[in-house]
């Protein structure tokens, strides 16, 4: 069926359909999303476990990035977007009227397809979010820079050039810098929207190895069009098609013995 070889680290899978509240980082309940009159997500319910990597896979335009962006309400920025249902982060509905969206996005970091460092130094990129929070102590900022760059496997490469422009880094280094910027504010969850789609194979492998390290500190949710990548990095995988959650299980089951024919057809290349 599929050569499942998660060489980047393996933990016994959880039963994602019977997670306890303690095991759950994100609970999505009867989620529907509309862009104007067009419905993009249809009644999605799932629980995403803490401290694991969960991958969303599916054909282009299937709704996987839309679903990802519901977790930190990035879809709020799209005119005409309407959401029904609930997305709970550690038990609290992020769509509750009293939720401060800026605070939510500090708790849920996000990395996009293309590296997007700011036109600032490497140092200032990392501390950007901390400065917005009012952190001014130099020692605190210095410590955060080293901690975050180490977490992003970038410290040894840039420790002697922290005050150089971030645009001088390679594409792979820039993406790791963006990850360092995201983790500097110590989020609970990291959302990765096709984070290696613009990178070369060597940089892609570095990011994949980094993802395996990041899950020791954060809950990671990744959207990827690359099924081999999903098999390598994810503990659990959700297959989405036409805005519907078709199948969700541990990655090994999805890629070697899927329960749904739609899933099997997709991962064997019959469509998508």
Curated annotation (Swiss-Prot):
InterPro entries: AAA+_ATPase, ABC_transporter-like_ATP-bd, ABC_transporter-like_CS, P-loop_NTPase, PstB-like. The gene is pstB1. ATP binds at residues 58-65. It is an enzyme of class 7 (translocase). The lineage of its organism: Bacteria, Pseudomonadati, Pseudomonadota, Gammaproteobacteria, Vibrionales. CDD domains: ABC_PstB_phosphate_transporter. One of its GO terms (cellular component) is plasma membrane. PANTHER family: ABC TRANSPORTER I FAMILY MEMBER 17 (PTHR43423), IRON EXPORT ATP-BINDING PROTEIN FETA-RELATED (PTHR43423:SF12). It is found in: Cell inner membrane. One of its GO terms (molecular function) is ATPase-coupled phosphate ion transmembrane transporter activity. The complex is composed of two ATP-binding proteins (PstB), two transmembrane proteins (PstC and PstA) and a solute-binding protein (PstS). GO terms for biological process: phosphate ion transmembrane transport. It is a peripheral membrane protein. This is Phosphate import ATP-binding protein PstB 1. Belongs to the ABC transporter superfamily. Phosphate importer (TC 3.A.1.7) family. SMART domains: AAA. Its EC number is 7.3.2.1. Residues 26-267 form the ABC transporter domain. It catalyses: phosphate(out) + ATP + H2O = ADP + 2 phosphate(in) + H(+). Its main location: membrane. Part of the ABC transporter complex PstSACB involved in phosphate import. Responsible for energy coupling to the transport system. Keywords: ATP-binding, Cell inner membrane, Cell membrane, Membrane, Nucleotide-binding, Phosphate transport, Translocase, Transport. Signal peptide: none annotated. Pfam families: ABC_tran.
């Amino acid at each position: 069926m599929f050569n499942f070889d998660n060489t980047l680290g393996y933990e016994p899978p959880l039963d994602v359909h019977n997670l306890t509240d303690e095991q759950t980082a994100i609970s999505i309940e009867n989620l529907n999303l509309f862009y104007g009159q067009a419905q993009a997500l249809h009644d999605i319910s799932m629980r995403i476990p803490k401290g694991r990597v969960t991958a969303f896979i599916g054909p282009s335009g299937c709704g996987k990035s839309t679903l990802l962006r519901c977790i930190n309400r990035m879809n709020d920025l799209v005119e005409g977007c309407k959401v029904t249902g609930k997305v709970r982060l550690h038990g609290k509905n992020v769509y509750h009227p009293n939720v401060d969206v800026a605070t939510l996005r500090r708790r849920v970091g996000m990395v996009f397809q293309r590296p997007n460092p700011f036109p600032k130094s490497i140092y200032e990129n990392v501390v950007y979010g901390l400065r917005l929070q009012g952190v001014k102590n130099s020692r605190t900022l210095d410590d955060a820079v080293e901690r975050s760059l180490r977490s992003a496997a970038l410290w040894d490469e840039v420790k002697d050039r922290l005050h150089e422009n971030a645009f001088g880094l390679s594409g792979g280094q820039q993406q790791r810098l963006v990850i360092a910027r995201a983790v500097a504010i110590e989020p609970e969850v990291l959302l990765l929207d096709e984070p290696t789609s613009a990178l070369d194979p060597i940089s892609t492998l570095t990011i994949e190895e980094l993802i395996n390290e990041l899950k020791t500190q954060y809950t990671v949710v990744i959207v990827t069009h690359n099924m081999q990548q999903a098999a390598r990095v994810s503990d659990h995988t959700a297959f989405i098609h036409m805005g519907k959650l078709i199948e969700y299980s541990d990655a090994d089951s999805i890629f070697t013995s899927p329960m749904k024919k739609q899933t099997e057809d997709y991962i064997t290349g019959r469509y998508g």
